[in-house]
């Protein structure tokens, strides 16, 4: 988080994030919390804000700074301790709060941290709302003038029993005519926010649960475990001869699955299998789903073969959700493991996704290896080309003709500049790896000549 005089953009694709104690400091968090409080009070309904966090040690520092800021502008703060990001989204609406705040850097190492905001309805903030908060952040006069005194100063209280509400909510997403009895599941909690909740949900539904990485110490979140490092989970699945393994990330909004043979399930295969299952049980709204620009062409063709439409969007679960709302859809996801079932959650929820996978396995009668391997992923090649200038793509001579030739061959391409680096990302995918490789080289050679690489 930059200092006030730089006027840099605070919000990234998923809230505000940075190294704790260097970028995310007590003073910057107080300024951000005060700014958010001013913004939310403009349309206040209940004068309450919910604050949750993951298991990072720096969460204490940030939480206290937020409480100080929010109470200083008159808000009453409810602190719920370590809880998954989707739990904060759910509980914000369920407990009728004006807003919810999650302190987490998701899958990042322990020394990073971040802050995510949810509105009264449990949705992530729109860009206009983020810009409103930023406008206050960079205006010290508005921050000072918003401070309350006397009886107008807010209060704070810690509530530890809200975990039960979330557990009931999650269990209600699982079909009531099914049980997990007879299933052995290894659950990697990433030493993160779901270390208590995940094993309880699975065991209460009848599963034999082996929980791993469920002992957070403030420094071991995501450390060689969880969704970013599922190799350890794969070994445990084989050791315990489990039916399936689930790996969550630090704030439990992401899910990676390991099948009964120890294979890490490709994210696009998981999306495809779940989409088809939702259609088969009559729950896929408008017979279409959302995936990102990075999802493999094989997923698109698999869905098409089952008469399921696909709408693509930019990378980021916020964009997945926006596209779902635009087309009135109830299922979408990213190959990285952020999957949204909007019938049950308004953001990616690793536990909801895990329960839908389990329902699929039970009703199919197949092993996880067979049920979650619905098609083969096509070969792809991605090149990140460093450039000295970001010349408009339409002004690169001959590029469109090359792209048209790739489309004519039946392959898919993605050519776009990075939003944060001086890089041009070139992706091609198709059935024949040799042709894919040749087409990538063709694009790289052309762009290198015209972008002063």
Curated annotation (Swiss-Prot):
Keyword terms: Isomerase, Magnesium, Metal-binding, Phosphoprotein
Classification via HAMAP family: GlmM_B (MF_01554_B)
GO biological process: carbohydrate metabolic process; peptidoglycan biosynthetic process; UDP-N-acetylglucosamine biosynthetic process
Cofactor names: Mg(2+)
Name of the protein in its database record: Phosphoglucosamine mutase
Family in the record: Belongs to the phosphohexose mutase family.
SUPFAM superfamilies the UniProt entry points to: Phosphoglucomutase, C-terminal domain, Phosphoglucomutase, first 3 domains
Annotated function: Catalyzes the conversion of glucosamine-6-phosphate to glucosamine-1-phosphate.
EC number(s) stated in the UniProt entry for this protein: 5.4.2.10
Sequence positions bearing Phosphoserine: 106
GO molecular function: magnesium ion binding; phosphoglucosamine mutase activity; phosphomannomutase activity
Modification after translation: Activated by phosphorylation.
Catalytic reaction annotation: alpha-D-glucosamine 1-phosphate = D-glucosamine 6-phosphate
Organism: Helicobacter hepaticus (strain ATCC 51449 / 3B1)
Active site (record annotation): 106 (phosphoserine intermediate)
GO cellular component, one term: cytosol
Binding-site residues, Mg(2+): 106, 249, 251, 253
PANTHER family: PHOSPHOGLUCOMUTASE (ALPHA-D-GLUCOSE-1,6-BISPHOSPHATE-DEPENDENT) (PTHR42946:SF1), PHOSPHOHEXOSE MUTASE (PTHR42946)
Disulfide cysteine pairs (residue numbers): none
């Amino acid at each position: 988080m930059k200092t006030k005089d730089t006027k840099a953009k605070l919000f990234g694709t998923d809230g505000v994030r940075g190294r704790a104690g260097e970028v995310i400091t007590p003073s910057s968090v107080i300024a951000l919390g005060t700014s958010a409080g001013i913004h939310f009070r403009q349309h206040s309904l209940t004068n309450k804000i919910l604050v949750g966090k993951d298991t990072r040690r720096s969460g204490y520092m940030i939480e206290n700074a937020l409480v100080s800021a929010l109470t200083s502008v008159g808000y009453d703060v409810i602190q719920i301790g370590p809880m998954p990001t989707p739990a904060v989204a759910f509980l914000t609406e369920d407990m009728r709060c004006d807003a919810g705040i999650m302190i987490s850097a998701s899958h990042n190492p322990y020394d990073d941290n971040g802050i995510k905001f949810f509105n009264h309805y449990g949705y992530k903030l729109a860009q206009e709302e983020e810009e409103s908060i930023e406008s206050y952040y960079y205006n010290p006069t508005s921050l000072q003038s918003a401070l309350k005194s006397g009886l107008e100063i807010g209060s704070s209280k810690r509530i530890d029993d809200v975990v039960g509400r979330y557990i009931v909510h999650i269990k209600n997403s699982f079909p009531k005519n099914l049980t997990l009895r007879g299933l052995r599941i290894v659950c990697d909690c990433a030493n993160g926010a779901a270390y208590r909740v995940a094993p309880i949900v699975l065991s209460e539904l009848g599963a034999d649960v082996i929980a791993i990485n469920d002992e957070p110490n403030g420094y071991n979140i995501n450390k060689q475990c969880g969704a970013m490092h599922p190799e350890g989970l794969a070994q445990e699945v084989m050791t315990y001869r489990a039916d399936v393994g689930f790996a969550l990330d630090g704030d439990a909004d992401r899910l990676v699955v390991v099948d009964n043979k120890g294979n890490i399930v490709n994210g696009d295969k998981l999306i495809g299998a779940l989409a088809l299952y939702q259609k088969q049980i009559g729950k896929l709204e408008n017979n279409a789903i959302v995936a990102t620009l990075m999802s493999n062409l094989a997923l698109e063709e698999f869905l098409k073969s089952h008469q399921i439409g696909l709408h693509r969007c930019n990378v980021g679960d916020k964009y997945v959700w926006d596209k779902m709302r635009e087309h009135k859809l109830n299922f979408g996801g990213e190959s990285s493991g952020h999957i949204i079932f909007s019938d049950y959650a308004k953001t990616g929820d690793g536990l909801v996704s895990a329960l839908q996978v389990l329902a699929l396995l039970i009703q199919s009668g197949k092993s996880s290896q067979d049920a979650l391997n619905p098609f083969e992923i096509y070969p792809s090649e991605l090149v990140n080309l460093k450039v000295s200038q970001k010349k408009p793509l339409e002004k690169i001579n001959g590029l469109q003709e090359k792209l048209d030739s790739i489309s004519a061959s039946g392959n898919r391409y993605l050519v776009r500049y990075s939003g944060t680096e001086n890089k041009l990302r070139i992706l091609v995918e198709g059935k024949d790896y040799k042709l894919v490789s040749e087409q990538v080289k063709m694009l790289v050679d052309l762009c290198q000549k015209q972008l002063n690489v």
